[in-house]
Structure formats: C-alpha cells, structure tokens
C-alpha cells in the first residue's frame, strides 16, 4: 500500500537534481517534507507515491522520475522531469515553467548529466548543493544534511517564484510606458523593467533610457541593445561624465543636483527628476540625436 504524499529518492550522497525535485513537489503541496524516504530498496520505494532519481523507471503517469536507465534518452535529470510533470498536470503555466527552467532547472539538468562543468572561480547552484554533503570523516547524519540542502533550495525556489510573479505585475506598467513614451520610459518607482521591456519587443522600440526614483534620488539608466548585451547601451552619456561625482559632475555637465555617473556611461544618478530630464536632453544633444 502506497504512502500518500510521500516521495522516495536514493540515500547516500545527494545532488542538486533530486533535492530540487523534492523541493518543487513540496512547494506545490504534493508531498510532505516528513515523508521523504531516502533508500535504494525497491520494496521501500514501491510504497512511495513519488519516486525520483532512483528506481530505473521514468513514467509520468506512475509518478516515477529516474533518468539513469538506458531506456531513457532525454536530456532531463529528475529535476527537469518533475518540472515538466508540474507543467503537464497544470500546476504551473508555460510561462512559469520556462522561467524556472531557464533560471535554474536546466542548469541542474546539464550539470547532473555531465554536459556542463563549472570553471574555477565560478560556483553553480549544483556546486552549492554538493557542499552540503558530509565529508567522509564526519560522523554526521546524511538525512540531516539533505534536509539543510532541501530547506536552502525551497527558500531559493520560493524567492524565484516571487520574482516571477513580481515581474508579471510590472509587465503591464512597462507596456503602458512603451505605448506612450519614445526616447525615455518614465516610472514612478523602481521596478523590473529590463526583462519585461525586451519580452514586449523592446529590441524594436526607440527608447534609449529609463528614468525612475530610488532612495530619494533619481536614476537615469541607458537601455541596452538587447539582453545579451546588457552592459552596453544604445546611447551612452557624454564621455567627460565618466566616473564623476557630485559637484564635479555638476560642473562638467552644467546640471545642478548631480550625484554620480558610472564610468561605463550607462547609469547616472541625480537628486531630482528635473535634473534627470536635463541630463537626458543634454545627452541626446551630445550624441546628435536631437
């Protein structure tokens, strides 16, 4: 007889794929954390409602999600399998599926299946989860370490989902600005504009800047050509503004209320909106656009 709301996965060393798979099922309220069973015993696993990363079977109908068997020739690990399951059974829409896949799960799949290896100086999500495993000489409970890694992953996934939901709320505001503004998009608060701008066809939009208040100051930020070149801008600030602060920037630009201009010429900060607008106008004149 199966144990409802239970999930079985292998014992011993754990990896990001089964930890992520378990976390996803917990977040979507399909399993209980206290019903995670770590074993390789087929009899024990047969009693679990879900089984992931062990058992040699991939069957979405039977809630079995292993990718190690020869009969499976796909690209997913157990994390990708569970994410796909959640989409197929209507627990998330396609947009959220692609967001979670592109921001986290695809990378977990790639590293678990040996198609990606971290470089020195870079630490992936899978590398972080690996660190939670106890060292051989440590007399610790692997289940307790698994639980620590699981809680970290649950928190991370919850924050990703909140970001996704927030981005969707911001999209309508960005769309309205794109429909009413041309060279500069004005917002009344900081928001997730960049991804939404390009999601809404921003590569073909004429806007070169965004302007919004932040921490009692005003930000004038250049828009990149596309997301792949996000550290570049369509229209840079004047060269002689690079790296200047406060009075020095005000003196060179002739604009009062200056705070800072990034040396990369993609961001400037001002004390008020009017100074931002003057900086915008001067920059467009400097670049021969108006």
Curated annotation (Swiss-Prot):
This is MYG1 protein CPn_0489/CP_0265/CPj0489/CpB0509. Belongs to the MYG1 family. Pfam families: MYG1_exonuc. It comes from Chlamydia pneumoniae (Chlamydophila pneumoniae).
């Amino acid at each position: 007889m199966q144990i409802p709301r239970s999930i079985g996965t292998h014992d011993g060393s754990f990896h990001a794929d089964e930890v992520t798979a378990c976390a996803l099922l917990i977040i979507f309220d399909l399993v209980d954390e206290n019903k995670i069973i770590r074993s390789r015993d087929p009899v024990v696993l047969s009693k679990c409602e879900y089984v992931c990363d062990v058992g040699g079977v991939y069957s979405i109908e039977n809630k079995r999600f292993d990718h190690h068997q020869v009969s499976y020739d796909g690209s997913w690990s157990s994390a990708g399998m569970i994410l796909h399951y959640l989409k197929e059974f209507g627990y998330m829409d396609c947009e959220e599926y692609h967001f979670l896949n592109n921001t986290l799960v695809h990378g977990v799949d790639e590293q678990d299946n040996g198609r990606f290896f971290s470089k020195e100086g870079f630490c992936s999500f899978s590398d972080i989860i690996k660190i939670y495993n106890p060292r051989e000489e440590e007399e610790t409970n692997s289940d307790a370490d698994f639980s620590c890694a699981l809680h970290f992953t649950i928190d991370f996934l919850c924050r990703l989902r909140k970001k996704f939901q927030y981005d969707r709320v911001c999209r309508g505001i960005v769309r309205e600005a794109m429909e009413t503004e041309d060279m500069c998009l004005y917002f009344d608060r900081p928001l997730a504009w960049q991804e939404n701008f390009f999601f809404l066809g921003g590569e073909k939009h004429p806007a070169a800047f965004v302007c919004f208040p932040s921490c009692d100051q005003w930000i004038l930020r250049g828009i990149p050509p596309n997301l792949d070149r996000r550290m570049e801008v369509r229209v840079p600030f004047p060269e002689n503004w690079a790296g200047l602060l406060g009075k020095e920037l005000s003196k060179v630009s002739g604009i009062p209320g200056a705070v800072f201009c990034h040396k990369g010429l993609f961001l400037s900060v001002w004390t008020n909106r009017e100074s931002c607008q003057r900086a915008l106008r001067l920059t467009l004149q400097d670049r021969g656009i108006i």
